């Protein structure tokens, strides 16, 4: 408590405690004079004052404890976050060069194999393969290039020509009959027309033609019963004539022969 005696809230609490002491002394004097109603009201007010003072002291202690704990917790969080921010550095070209030179020095220090019989020298095949692997590992960083935009590689002249070809009208020459102003436009359109790949159109197989046979139309005539009877009679009479026709023909032939003889 000695550290917090200079705090302004503690000073107010001390003053309130002193005032409460004086208040208690005054109440005891009133009780001696048999003034019970005044004593009861004073006791209730004193109880309220003590409760509020206790609540205020508890709040002060909690706030002071939090203020002390906050500065101690901040450095710990910073210390834990610092190692997370550090990322491992990529190997630089200098490290690759140093490793490459060290491997070359080791390969040069080893003497080549010499055949005493033929006098020929043979290098170490294992060292050659190792050198090739080291070179293949060290080259990618040096040979890496930034991606080049295809738009930047094209010169600006091509864009201008393309724009000109689009703006000029393309007129077919078949429509320029008798128009002298149309003929130069027709030629310019053919020269400046943008070159495009020919479009291949697949021809569809023709559908087989189906010939529809004409349908016979039957006409039905309404016939009365009287007409039906007449047709039946007509059909009956020719049959009789047909049956009697050979005899009749023979009779006619005989009559004709007799006439010729009489003449």
From Swiss-Prot:
One of its GO terms (cellular component) is extracellular region. Glycans are attached at residues 72, 80, 87, 92, 105, 127, 139, 163, 199, 215, 231, 251, 253. Residues 111-121, 151-166, 232-263 have a biased composition (Polar residues). Changing residue 8 to L: In strain: ATCC 51908. The keyword Repeat does not apply. Changing residue 111 to L: In strain: ATCC 51908. Pfam families: Glycoprotein_G. Residues 69-166, 223-263 are annotated as: Disordered. The keyword Secreted applies. Changing residue 249 to H: In strain: ATCC 51908. It comes from the Viruses. Changing residue 114 to T: In strain: ATCC 51908. The chain crosses the membrane at residues 38-66. Disulfide bonds join 173-186, 176-182. Residues 1-37 are cytoplasmic. Residues 72-92, 100-110 have a biased composition (Low complexity). Changing residue 220 to H: In strain: ATCC 51908. Residues 187-198 are annotated as: Binding to host heparan sulfate. Changing residue 77 to I: In strain: ATCC 51908. One of its GO terms (biological process) is symbiont entry into host cell. Changing residue 96 to Y: In strain: ATCC 51908. Residues 67-263 are extracellular. Keywords: Disulfide bond, Glycoprotein, Host cell membrane, Host membrane, Host-virus interaction, Membrane, Secreted, Transmembrane, Transmembrane helix, Viral attachment to host cell, Viral immunoevasion, Virion, Virus entry into host cell. Belongs to the pneumoviruses glycoprotein G family. This is Major surface glycoprotein G.
